[in-house]
């Protein structure tokens, strides 16, 4: 994963400010995804295929990051919050679980999550990658 950030320096010139791996990368327990914090509200997650265990995760990394994400059951990663999430499948395919409903999403598909807590499971047998863009909404 490579992140390139552009900006303007003190003289007003456009510059490349950074080029490399995102500074915040962490892995969630068990079959949890690897999370790449691209920017404040943009995350890209790599989901291992269901059934593969990632037993050597760093417990301390979980304590450093906000609890916007949890692991439900053994393999389904679920997300909570008062926001609209734009979920863009970049690589592979995922199963989106909401209550009794399951739907397959593939590379190129976009899911809009509105104040819901669905679970995501990778049943494809290969690595899958999903970008999440989080937009907070006000509670009424």
Where are these regions (language model features)?
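Extracellular structured ligand-interaction cores
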Residues: 1-3, 42, 81-84, 93, ...
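N-terminal leader/capping segments at the start of a protein or of a new domain
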Residues: 1-41
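Short, surface-exposed charged micro-motifs
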Residues: 4-5, 86, 110, 119
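Short, ordered coil/turn segments that flank beta-strands lining enzyme active or ligand-binding pockets
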Residues: 10, 90, 123
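Conserved short histidine dyad/triad with adjacent acidic residue
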Residues: 22, 42-81, 114-118, 136-138
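Ligand-binding loop in jelly-roll beta-barrel domains
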Residues: 72, 95, 102-109, 115-140
């Amino acid at each position: 994963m490579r992140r390139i950030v552009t900006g303007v320096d003190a003289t007003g010139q456009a510059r490349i400010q950074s080029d490399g791996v995102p500074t915040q990368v962490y892995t969630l327990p068990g079959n949890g995804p690897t999370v790449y914090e691209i920017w404040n509200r943009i995350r890209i997650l790599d989901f291992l295929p269901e059934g593969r265990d990632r037993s050597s995760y760093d417990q301390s990394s979980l304590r450093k990051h906000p609890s916007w994400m949890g692991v439900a059951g053994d393999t389904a990663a679920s997300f909570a919050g008062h926001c609209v999430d734009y979920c863009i499948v970049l690589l592979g395919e995922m199963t989106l679980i909401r209550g009794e409903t399951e739907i397959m999403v593939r590379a190129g598909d976009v899911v809009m999550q509105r104040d819901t807590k669905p679970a995501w499971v990778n049943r494809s047998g290969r690595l899958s990658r999903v970008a999440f863009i989080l937009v907070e909404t006000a509670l009424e």
